[in-house]
Curated annotation (Swiss-Prot):
Alphabetical list of Gene3D superfamilies matching this protein: HesB-like domain
Signal peptide (residue range): none
Organism: Aliivibrio fischeri (strain ATCC 700601 / ES114)
CC cofactor: iron-sulfur cluster
Official protein name in the record: Iron-sulfur cluster insertion protein ErpA
InterPro entries (alphabetical): FeS_biogenesis (IPR000361), FeS_cluster_insertion (IPR016092), FeS_cluster_insertion_CS (IPR017870), FeS_cluster_insertion_RrpA (IPR023063), HesB-like_dom_sf (IPR035903)
One GO cellular component, as annotated: cytosol
Details of cofactor binding: Binds 1 iron-sulfur cluster per subunit.
Binding locations of iron-sulfur cluster: 41, 105, 107
Keywords: Iron, Iron-sulfur, Metal-binding
GO molecular function: 2 iron, 2 sulfur cluster binding; 4 iron, 4 sulfur cluster binding; iron ion binding
Gene name of this polypeptide: erpA
Biological process according to GO: iron-sulfur cluster assembly
Primary role: Required for insertion of 4Fe-4S clusters for at least IspG.
Length: 113
């Protein structure tokens, strides 16, 4: 995969957290699925869920033995972005650093392009 340009980055910190969560669930078939839906205060919302399946057309990114999955419709809004994880005063969460977002809400959960 070194010859292929990956349109989305899956950080080491996020991969490590996913690995921990998968171990807690005791299901090694789980993958982190990232998706975009309409809604939120800025028009689009990021979503994260665990999924055992990879659908036709999904893009997968491997890091530290775990897999990130993105459907083609969501990927078009995430190109050049980075899936990451943070722990802070407001709690812990996965987030996306998205260069395509022209505006984001205060919590970073929704955006517009």
């Amino acid at each position: 995969m070194s010859d292929v340009s990956v349109p989305l980055t899956f950080s080491d910190v996020a991969a490590a957290k996913v690995k921990t969560l998968i171990a807690e669930e005791e299901n090694p078939n789980l993958k982190l699925r990232v998706y975009i839906t309409g809604g939120g205060c800025s028009g689009f919302q990021y979503g994260f869920t665990f999924d055992e399946d990879v659908n036709e057309g999904d893009m997968t990114i491997e890091n530290d033995g775990v897999t990130l999955v993105v459907d083609p419709m969501s990927l078009q809004y995430l190109i050049g972005g980075k899936v990451d994880y943070t722990e802070g005063l407001e709690g812990s969460r996965f987030f996306i650093d998205n260069p395509n977002a022209t505006t984001t809400c205060g919590c970073g959960a929704s955006f517009s392009v």
